[in-house]
Regions:
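Bacterial N-terminal signal peptides that target proteins for export
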Residues: 2-11
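Bacterial N-terminal signal peptides
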Residues: 11-19
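C-terminal motif of bacterial Sec signal peptides marking the signal peptidase cleavage site
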Residues: 21-23
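Functional-site microenvironments in short loops/helix caps that host divalent-cation chemistry
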Residues: 28-44, 65-66, 72, 77, ...
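Short, P/G- and charge-enriched loop/turn segments at secondary-structure junctions
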Residues: 51-53, 83-86, 499, 529-534
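A short glycine-rich, aromatic-capped structural motif
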Residues: 55-149, 161-184, 352, 542-543, ...
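Catalytic loop of the DD-peptidase/beta-lactamase superfamily, centered on the K-T-G motif
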Residues: 528-531, 536, 541, 547-548
Length: 562
């Protein structure tokens, strides 16, 4: 009997302890009410609204998830070229997405077709838009080589449809990325029943969809055509319930629209290319990697493919692919995408085939002393232009701004339907500690304060006058402009013939990474870096897009960490 009483008493104590423990640690989940005010969420009467169904960012078309982390950026081996432009430094990149492959000819042709249909070059207002987007097919020509077959066929012939596009400048790659963002988000809205079915087809001249315009001034999307902007079944259903509803248009808080496609930063590209996940042991890297694949050699060591090259690159003098019947890499110029095995992130051709543009402005030094998180040089901060009525300014056919590049090529700065962008000014920079100007491309490396000729004596940096011939980087200053119609029109070019120029570095040269079909294996190392003018193109530089990840760092379920 006593034993039974003791057991019952112990069970009672245990249950009370459990109840107290659970009661003290119980917290509200606030799924249906505001953590700030206690108000009900998503009430029909009004109040705060929340997309409670949102889970994680979806992977956009063509992209692969790359979980971010810390890594040693820069060369981790000898520097036989003595460039001294990529000393090792520790960097951290956030998780992001990157194209599985390089952008192909067929992908770029879709862009050209869209421009030609929406902004027909027969219209004088739009003629230069299409011309400015065309790749430079003459990059294949060589004074002592016969390459006319590539000049005439490489971009458009179906035999090369799945080959990486070349002849594209950095500026054109950025414009393609912007176009891709809008087309992906346009399709999302149609699938969600917001915009009219097939609204993206058969548009009139200049009636375009812009993600930025839709988020900031949705009534101006598709040229203000409400039958397209609110023509979906879901929009019609919302409008029937309440014509004054504020939910007629998708907003950023709904989480439906994708972040922008863009060029990857140099840090992102290098991190994704090297793919250190294969040498990770718990929370440490077991060693270093020379290439995107494991090992110190460019040839496969596997039994089935032993001796085959793992990338498309130049084998030696006069050898771009081996001998007939036994090609080492299966290509002499570029190769079709996915011809070689992907790296450990699932990315193809991160070494070889074509080198790739990245977002950064080139400088010999990565300034890790100032920043070691999401490093990027090239920030130019802008804002939406506002008219006298307090509304954003939308670019029209009559207000397109064209830029004449140093090559004489004319490109549109903004397309009709987009919001006009202007540099940030003192309204955004006054007493701000993070930045003080719109253009930060040469910050701490090329600006006035970083040159040895800078002497402030108490003046503000923008008040100090320095001789233009005493710039930190004494690069050529070619001048180009357009002639008036009275002078016959065309382009006025003035080549800088000065013999005192000592550098090619300026704010208009961009980094490109990776080796190509035209390079020796030295350049297959993802740490190697080179630069090229942003408005020029070659037959060995292509590109791929990236996209930032919003939300959690990983797509994997949470697990215990030790």
């Amino acid at each position: 009997m006593n034993l039974t009483k003791k057991l019952a008493f112990r069970l009672l104590i245990l249950s009370l302890t459990t109840t107290l423990f659970v009661g003290c640690n119980k917290t509200r989940d606030y799924k249906d009410s505001s953590r700030a005010t206690g108000w009900s969420l998503n009430s029909k009467e009004g109040g705060p609204q929340k997309n409670s169904k949102y889970k994680e960012q979806e992977t956009g078309p063509g992209l692969v998830f790359v979980e971010g982390g810390t890594f040693t950026m820069g060369r981790v081996q000898d520097d036989p070229m003595h460039d001294w432009n990529n000393s090792p430094n520790q960097q951290h990149v956030q998780s992001f997405y990157m194209d599985e492959t390089e952008v192909t000819n067929y992908m770029y042709l879709q862009y050209l077709q869209w421009i030609k249909e929406v902004f027909p070059p027969e219209n004088e207002n739009y003629r230069k838009i299409y011309e400015g987007a065309l790749p430079d097919t003459l990059v294949w020509r060589n004074r002592l080589g016969y390459n006319e077959v590539m000049t005439n066929n490489y971009l458009r012939h179906p035999a090369y449809a799945e080959y990486p596009v070349v002849g594209v400048s950095w500026i054109q790659a950025v414009e393609f990325s912007n176009w891709r963002t809008d087309r992906v988000n346009e399709l999302i809205l149609e699938k969600e029943g917001i915009t009219a079915r097939n609204a993206r087809y058969g548009l009139k001249d200049g009636e375009t969809f812009s993600t930025s315009t839709y988020l900031n001034a949705p009534t101006q999307t598709y040229g203000g055509n409400d039958s397209l902007t609110r023509g979906g079944n879901r929009s019609k259903s919302i409008e029937k319930r309440s014509k004054d509803s504020t939910n007629l248009y998708i907003q950023r808080k709904d989480g439906l629209l994708m972040p922008a496609y863009r060029l990857p930063t140099e840090a992102e590209w290098e991190y994704a290319a090297i793919g250190l996940v294969s040498v990770r042991n718990f929370n440490n890297y077991r060693g270093r990697k020379k290439y995107p694949w494991d090992g110190q050699y460019t040839r496969s060591g596997k039994r089935k493919t032993q001796g085959d090259q793992l990338a498309n690159f130049k084998q030696g003098d006069g050898d771009y692919g081996g001998i007939a019947g036994w090609s080492d890499d299966g290509a002499d110029i570029t190769a079709e995408i996915k011809s070689y095995q992907p790296n450990d992130f699932g990315l193809y051709d991160m070494s070889g085939n074509v080198a790739e543009w990245v977002a950064d402005v080139y400088r010999p030094i990565v300034d890790d002393g100032f920043n070691d998180f999401n490093y990027y040089r090239g920030n130019v901060y802008t804002k939406n232009a506002i008219d006298e009525n307090g509304k954003v300014k939308i670019v029209t056919a009559d207000s397109i701004v064209y830029d004449t590049l140093s090559t004489g090529k004319v490109i549109a700065r903004n397309l009709p339907g987009e919001i006009l962008q202007v540099p940030v000014d003192e309204n955004e920079t006054y007493l701000r500690t993070q930045f003080s100007t719109s253009d930060n491309r040469d910050y701490r490396d090329g600006d006035k304060a970083s040159t040895r000729f800078y002497q402030s004596f108490g003046e503000q940096e923008d008040e100090v006058v320095i001789d233009p011939n005493k710039r930190m980087y004494n690069s050529p200053n070619h001048k180009v402009g357009t002639l008036d119609e009275s002078e016959g029109g065309g382009v006025d070019r003035e080549f800088d013939k000065s013999s005192s120029r000592t550098s090619m570095i300026n704010n208009e040269v961009r980094v490109y990474k990776g080796g190509s079909w035209k390079d020796r294996d030295y350049w297959l190392d993802p740490a190697q870096r080179r630069y090229f003018p942003q408005d020029m193109a070659t037959d060995y530089i292509g590109f791929r897009c990236a996209m930032s990840r919003v939300g959690s760092k990983t797509t994997q379920p949470k697990r215990a960490r030790h």
